[in-house]
């Protein structure tokens, strides 16, 4: 069995307290972007969840640098995948003895950064 030279690193953030639709807005924004540019965009993004995405991206960059020895100046965000996690169900009392269910959604985030060759 031949071992391939790995040129990508991953990081994940699980059970983030935000809906997957809102998280995917930020994740889709940084897909196929250089890591340095993505970090700047996430720093100044008005979205609340951008801070969590930035932390996960910084973790992926640290994994690439420390575990694989990749050059951080040539890293590109190749995958930013969002998945649904658990749903916390709550009950809100309403008028006339009724009750309404409130769903609080959680999401998972997976980020992959790859070292691109200079062309």
Curated annotation (Swiss-Prot):
This is Large ribosomal subunit protein uL22. One of its GO terms (biological process) is translation. Belongs to the universal ribosomal protein uL22 family. The keyword rRNA-binding applies. It comes from Rickettsia conorii (strain ATCC VR-613 / Malish 7). One of its GO terms (molecular function) is structural constituent of ribosome. Gene3D superfamilies: Ribosomal protein L22/L17. The keyword Iron does not apply. Part of the 50S ribosomal subunit. Disulfide bonds: none annotated. One of its GO terms (cellular component) is cytosolic large ribosomal subunit. This protein binds specifically to 23S rRNA; its binding is stimulated by other ribosomal proteins, e.g. L4, L17, and L20. It is important during the early stages of 50S assembly. It makes multiple contacts with different domains of the 23S rRNA in the assembled 50S subunit and ribosome. The globular domain of the protein is located near the polypeptide exit tunnel on the outside of the subunit, while an extended beta-hairpin is found that lines the wall of the exit tunnel in the center of the 70S ribosome. HAMAP family: Ribosomal_uL22_B (MF_01331_B). Keywords: Ribonucleoprotein, Ribosomal protein, RNA-binding, rRNA-binding. It comes from the Bacteria. The gene is rplV. Pfam families: Ribosomal_L22 (PF00237).
